[in-house]
Amino acid sequence: MEILNQFSQFSPNMEAQGASSIPQPSQDAHEKARQQAENQETAKNGMISQILDQAAMQRLSNLAVAKPEKAQMVEAALINMARRGQLSGKMTDDGLKALMERVSAQTQKATSVKFDRRRNELDSDEELDL
């Protein structure tokens, strides 16, 4: 019975409406999510500006332009260090360099080149009948 009641609520020209009758996520929800992300970004930037001195902020900005993923990792490490109380005062440029080197060492991928020489197939002695 409940299903029949739901169908009776639909208008007879429902088929003509097509996709417009499908409930869409409200624009308010998208706006709210965007606003929340913007607030989190602002809070993160505020924390980082309190953690780093001017030279270190400039270096982090340069890193964010060149390698955004690595900059996000460094920012996360800085915020975690600040929350744990591992930082005393503002971090200098040298301290940021050391942190960047540690993050790079942890995330560095080992690249290797492997040559697969097929000696049996490319043996030139067989071709020359020596």
Swiss-Prot record:
SUPFAM superfamilies: Double-stranded DNA-binding domain (SSF46950). The keyword Lyase does not apply. One of its GO terms (molecular function) is DNA binding. Keywords: Coiled coil. One of its GO terms (cellular component) is cytosol. The keyword Zinc-finger does not apply. Pfam families: dsDNA_bind (PF01984). Residues 1-27, 36-46 have a biased composition (Polar residues). InterPro entries: PDCD5-like, PDCD5-like_sf. Residues 1-46, 103-130 are annotated as: Disordered. It comes from the Eukaryota. Residues 27-51 form a coiled coil. Gene3D superfamilies: PDCD5-like. Belongs to the PDCD5 family. This is Uncharacterized protein D2005.3. It comes from Caenorhabditis elegans.
